[in-house]
């Protein structure tokens, strides 16, 4: 829905076929509006218009690739990925070879467009180790070729200075197998000269900026561009281009393609030779005869070049400063003047670089070409230099613009002229659309008899004095009345004055505009003459790569035949290219340059309008609006879509046209969408075609399911028959096997029964002579004797009856160890039982008290260890012997548990007073020892808890309930010499009386309740503490410190 909205947007439609009203102004306004939104792609039907934004845009992400993969061309926004996907699917699904023609001015973004197409095809094709390797090699050919074939021009920082056509070959699944690259007319004159504001080829700057110090030393180069005469010193560094990083990327790309390190080194050595040739300086001198000659001014550069290529410096110097002229059967060595020497030096540099570039392309082809014998489909991608109009246009611009005229001719013939002619041939009603046919311009240039290239070749081969003046004169004579040719002389003949046209220039009215060409250098560049002495010198070099570039230098193969001229070679190459393109289904990407300053997102309407006019976009829109988007012969159309109708599927016995009519009638498409020609079916709207293709895909899926069902059924039947046959065979063999096993088992059983019977008879006969159970009886006897001996020995060596003695004799035999341990345990339990039976009730009570004390104080209070050896007597006052104390016992009225003398700590001043403590089963009594009168009688139920310290003191704090009678005076602080026994008996008595344990706190600091409030008691271990009685000190009204020793 989003894409459809974009295509139908009234302000900026995505497809110019839908533009209403259609005019140059509305078309230009639409392109500008879309460009301002960042939408640089627009459709004219299936033609993509691309406007160069001169900045990166976030529209080439993997998510975008996924969005356009296998998608309807018009179901998504206009994008270069859409035409790449459409071409790829046509190649894969329709088995039609494709070519993608990318045209436009220099700087319009053609090279980037070709890389985007290649990267998209690589992304959507299948994955796999071998396939990924091929795709990576195809993609990595771009950085290598760009380094050696691209340069900065006035209009483009990365202008292709050669034409590149790549045929990518695929298998039937659409996986890339490899490819072949063809290159056309490298601008080798750029090696020796280029205009101000431009640069030489990228590789020179990359090598000097990115080469390591070791590499540059090996190539005898300096990292300073100003040192080399062939480099433009003013523009050596290009903003926004990292030459060092690009050099590393080129090296990585070469490794991926498969260049060996030795090949890379050899390639860079030859490149360095070209660069250093520009530093070879010549000076004028005179021979003895008075003839002018030349000599090398600075021999160092010559020596370094000679070292790089493995050639004697004198041989190279002789080749640069002289030439051999053959007169009949004699060879004469002629000295060259300085100008002739420089011409030879530059010609050598141009030829070395040009042939090195050809070798580079062939070497890449060696790595990426497909092995012969494989069936393959082809997608061609053409990236060639765009139309060029400079201030001074020479031979290179003439050749480049001729190539662009041929590409425009293809576009005209295949999209405008041929399409309209086809409608007439097929009898389709059609209103002709006027358009400019540039055949007249192509004929002006390439006519084999009177074309400009033919006249240039004739002038180059003509004997006598040959120069550009005779060439321009001949052109003026032949094309004096030609509508597309102008010169100073032809205009003067028509009485037209044009001061902008110099004498040695001619002007051609190209489809892209008028271009004025300066004929200076035409003959020289067309001849491309290289002295044979230089070729032979290169052949004599020991450098393997350089030697292979000059096979004509072999003295054993002399040839007097002149090599073909540059113009004739290029004309033949273009003809081959055009033939190749005509054999494929074309897909067009028309690139437009929005401004001349390479400014990001700047749109210059006048410049764009000029390109819209000469690219014929208006005519293209008119033809598309009036024409049909798809046409195909009836037979392949019916073969492809016949499964959509039950009447034509699976076989149609009638004619192909009748079958197509029956098929489309059943599908019920609108009549205006279809037209039936004499031999072809025509479909007007791409949407109708996409709907047809969508139905076919659904039907193919259904048929595939049907075929799978039938195949699975056939497989199941075959599998069943095989399993049934196998089951019968296995059953037969198994039954036989079972019968044989049964027979063997029966035989073994019979033999076994016979053996047992014979044995039984024999044993019965001789039983009285054998003692079969003697061994068992003997072993049982020995076992019983050993057990008896063990028990008797144990009886004699029993350990003492002391409970603390846990010794036990070891087992004499290993098999008795478990029994020995069990007897040890039984004996110890019996010994403990006997010990308990001997105890008196008083001893039992004391042991229980000791156990309770252990549970309360062990590892918690230091005094506990001293109480272990002290018996718990309970009564320490001698109440029965002392009559004075007997009346105290009467006060208690219940059973006495413990009686002892204690010290009571005064709550007011912390001083201690002696008291007698009597603990009975229900009360605790404190009495005056002198008067033997009770001072306090406490019920055990009134005791809330007790607190003691961790040290070895006898301090005890009894916490009383506030609600009790004695509790009103506060808690009690007592010092007992038998603290452990006192607390233990108090705990046991409380358990017996109330079934509740005594809450006991063992801490150095605890809180007590006195009449005047709570007091924090802190027990401190100190040398100042008293011996048996602690020292109590009050620290204010709420703190008390007790020092213990």
UniProtKB/Swiss-Prot annotation:
GO terms for molecular function: actin filament binding; ATP binding; calmodulin binding; microfilament motor activity. PANTHER family: MYOSIN (PTHR13140), UNCONVENTIONAL MYOSIN-IA (PTHR13140:SF291). GO terms for biological process: actin filament organization; actin filament-based movement; endocytosis; endosomal transport; sensory perception of sound; transcytosis. Keywords: Actin-binding, ATP-binding, Calmodulin-binding, Motor protein, Myosin, Nucleotide-binding, Repeat. Residues 701-727, 723-750, 746-774 form the IQ domain. The keyword ATP-binding applies. Residues 11-697 form the Myosin motor domain. Belongs to the TRAFAC class myosin-kinesin ATPase superfamily. Myosin family. Residues 861-1044 form the TH1 domain. The keyword Nucleotide-binding applies. Residues 574-596 are annotated as: Actin-binding. Could play an important role in morphogenesis and function of intestinal microvilli. This is Unconventional myosin-Ia. It holds the Pfam family Myosin_head. GO terms for cellular component: actin cytoskeleton; actin filament; brush border; cytoplasm; lamellipodium; lateral plasma membrane; microvillus; myosin complex. InterPro entries: IQ_motif_EF-hand-BS (IPR000048), Kinesin_motor_dom_sf (IPR036961), Myosin_head_motor_dom-like (IPR001609), Myosin_TH1 (IPR010926), MYSc_Myo1 (IPR036072), P-loop_NTPase (IPR027417). Intestine. ATP binds at residues 104-111. PROSITE patterns: IQ, MYOSIN_MOTOR, TH1.
